[in-house]
């Protein structure tokens, strides 16, 4: 399975969310939370746990950049714990899941100084805070699992927390010169653990026929978190290189801008990320379990499946097959049409016939899932289908019936999308008609 292309998710800085406005002190913010935090809860949220779930859902459906709201969730969990000190009523698994998730989420709000000469003491303090948040989150998960063994929601939450911990606590402080002996864990083994826990959640959901747990964007976040992590590893070190080049003369930057993505950062065998970067098993795991996710959604009554979840899973699968098709597609077009390769039998270990068949198969699969991701209210999803059809058409013989049929259908889709968006896709349509 092909590695993902640069730019699917932007390194660890995309995971560490910055506060847009700095408060003078965290203590002051905490003291004012009750009067500042106003959240509209869903209808029917009468009991305290339902209200907590509503608060949690409000955060999930937001931009997830509101530290005040996360602290509000944690304070509500603390209050529920205090009111239940006698243990007369056992708190449900979802309580522990929400509590742990919120504690882990706080790690994303730890300030990271922009100054180059950041004091070592400040770095250590920042790292310490992140570690404390994750330790507390994982401790809460274990408390929940003691009371609710193998609960699917708790297992899913634990898997997601571990993946976030890998990124923020273990990968974020690394440089290209880091060595395995410098950190306390083997990153790939911790990642294996996170994925094994998710697999256990799949098994337990299947045993209990609890497929509804997958009908949720929060659960789907795990696959996105893994995709982000793999993207960070694939492109590790490139961001620093780009930042250095930004300091160069603007004209030089423009001249060299097209070459940035071509730079390959080599990691030594004793680098903490070497195993993940050089293995394709994690990419394949992502693909396999995204398929499983879709299969689990299909086990629900179709009318109960959230359309946005179904479309998102299909979209991700479609895009992954398109990305995998890029190399064989390039090989085919190069060997078939590039005069510089006239007479060449192979490129990247593929003949023109092999590259053509592999590309056609992959893009046909991509089309299947992109059609499943189509949203009648979103012309962008129509254009995704049309562009895949054009790419597939390019892989057939010129003026063949297969090519003409694909181009014709793509043209109809683009015209419809263009009309719906006042000409937003005019360039794509004109390019198709010209060729």
Curated annotation (Swiss-Prot):
Share an example GO biological-process annotation for this protein: regulation of translation
- Transcription regulation is among the record's keywords: yes
- Renumbered residue ranges of the record's region Disordered: 1-44, 239-263
Keywords in alphabetical order, please.
Answer: Nucleus, Transcription, Transcription regulation, Translation regulation
- Composition bias of kind Basic and acidic residues appears in 18-31
User: Where primarily located?
Assistant: nucleus
Q: InterPro entries of this UniProt entry?
A: Nro1/ETT1
Q: Transcription regulation as a keyword?
A: yes
State the Pfam families in the record.
Nro1
Q: Where in the cell is it found?
A: Nucleus
Q: Which family does it belong to?
A: Belongs to the ETT1 family.
The name this protein goes by in its record: Enhancer of translation termination 1
Q: Give the species this sequence originates from.
A: Candida tropicalis (strain ATCC MYA-3404 / T1) (Yeast)
């Amino acid at each position: 399975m092909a590695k993902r292309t640069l730019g699917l998710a932007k390194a660890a800085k995309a995971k560490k969310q910055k506060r847009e406005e700095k408060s003078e002190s965290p203590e002051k913010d905490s003291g004012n939370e009750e009067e500042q935090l106003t959240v509209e809860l869903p209808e029917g949220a009468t009991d305290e746990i339902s209200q907590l779930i509503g608060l949690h859902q409000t955060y999930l459906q937001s931009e997830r950049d509101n530290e005040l709201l996360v602290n509000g969730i944690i304070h509500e969990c603390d209050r529920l714990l205090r009111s239940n000190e006698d243990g007369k009523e056992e708190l449900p698994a979802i309580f522990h899941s929400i509590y742990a998730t919120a504690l882990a989420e706080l790690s994303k709000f730890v300030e990271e100084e922009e100054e180059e000469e950041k004091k070592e003491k400040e770095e250590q303090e920042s790292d310490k805070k992140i570690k404390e948040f994750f330790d507390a989150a994982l401790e809460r998960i274990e408390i929940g699992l003691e009371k609710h063994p193998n609960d699917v929601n708790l297992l899913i939450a634990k898997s997601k927390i571990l993946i976030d911990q890998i990124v923020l606590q273990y990968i974020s402080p690394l440089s290209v010169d880091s060595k395995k002996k410098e950190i306390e864990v083997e990153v790939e083994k911790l990642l294996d653990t996170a994925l094994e826990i998710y697999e256990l959640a799949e098994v337990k959901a299947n045993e209990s026929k609890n497929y509804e747990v997958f009908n949720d964007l929060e659960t789907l976040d795990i696959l996105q978190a893994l995709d982000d992590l793999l993207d960070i590893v694939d492109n590790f070190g490139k961001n620093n290189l780009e930042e250095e080049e930004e300091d160069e003369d603007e004209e030089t930057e423009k001249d060299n801008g097209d070459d940035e993505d071509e730079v390959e950062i080599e990691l030594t065998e004793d680098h903490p990320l070497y195993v993940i970067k050089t293995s394709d098993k994690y990419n394949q795991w992502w693909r396999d379990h995204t398929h499983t996710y879709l299969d689990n959604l299909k086990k629900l009554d179709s009318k109960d499946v959230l359309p946005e979840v179904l479309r998102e899973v299909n979209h991700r699968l479609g895009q992954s097959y398109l990305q995998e098709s890029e190399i064989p597609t390039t090989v085919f077009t190069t060997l078939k049409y590039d005069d510089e390769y006239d007479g060449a039998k192979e490129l990247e270990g593929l003949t023109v016939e092999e590259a053509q068949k592999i590309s056609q198969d992959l893009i046909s699969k991509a089309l299947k899932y992109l059609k499943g991701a189509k949203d009648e209210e979103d012309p962008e999803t129509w254009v995704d289908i049309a562009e895949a059809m054009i790419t597939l058409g390019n892989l057939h013989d010129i003026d063949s019936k297969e090519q003409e049929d694909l181009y014709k259908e793509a043209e109809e889709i683009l015209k419809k999308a263009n009309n719906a968006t006042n000409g937003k896709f005019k360039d794509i349509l004109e390019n198709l008609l010209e060729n």
